[in-house]
Amino acid sequence: MALATERAGFKQIAVEDFRITEEPYYLPISDEVQLFETAYRENVPVLLKGPTGAGKTRFVEYMSWRLHNRDGIGHAEGVPLITVACHEDLTASDLVGRYLLEGDETRWIDGPISRAVKNGAICYLDEIVEARKDTTVLIHPLTDYRRLLPLEKRGELLEAADGFLLVMSYNPGYQSALKDLKHSTRQRFIAIEFDYPPREQEAQIIAKESGVDPAIANELAKLAEKVRNLKEHGLGEGVSTRLLVYAGKLIHDGITPRRACQVSIVWALTDDQEVQRSIEEVVSSIFE
């Protein structure tokens, strides 16, 4: 029986036990599925490159589900998936593990990458360029034939279990001299590039994910194409497929298309009033 303070649907599990057991919706655009499956079989680390909201994380979830063993009645048990949202304060200890005080004793607590190595999981480092450069160096022994993770504080080496794969992602549009991958890191991965889908496929994704009418989904995909062309006129980044799905969900639940686009796209993309007006003009030309 759930505790009184817990809400329905709440779950708490160890990160190494997390599996995608239901198929996530993912529409392949090119040969990315075949490339990832081959990399997984050959223990080749994978780097995913692409703009925000282009489907990188959903792709990893889909591949985690797809790389599974099915039992006799068709139920799927996906490969364990451990995700780390990288940030500028992420340290090597955050990834590998650290000693913690418990009373008069110290106890070693594994970090997410150590747990992934031990359990044969996919370890997904999301937005890796946000992490400190000295942090990313620790993964180097995991990304070649050695497949080893040094635990310097314990004087140990962890040899990756079968099934372990290191996957990283980043947005090339956010690169700068201070936030870029070291060449010694980049050349340890194969790179799969993501971009926003062509209009027909994007409309299909919007309709499936939001439940909105296909005709509206097509108009949203058309809107996306036009808004992305504004990148050369002050817009920092094009509208993501994710935001289009949000707009579709609002429309599906009764919000007018123009209002849904205003809160999901116009205001979400920029605070620059001139750019906002430009986007609103595009919205008005499509949703009269």
Predicted regions and their residues:
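AAA+ P-loop NTPase catalytic core and its hallmark functional loops
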Residues: 1-218, 222, 284-288
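A short, ordered amphipathic alpha-helix with a cationic face
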Residues: 192-195, 234, 253, 270
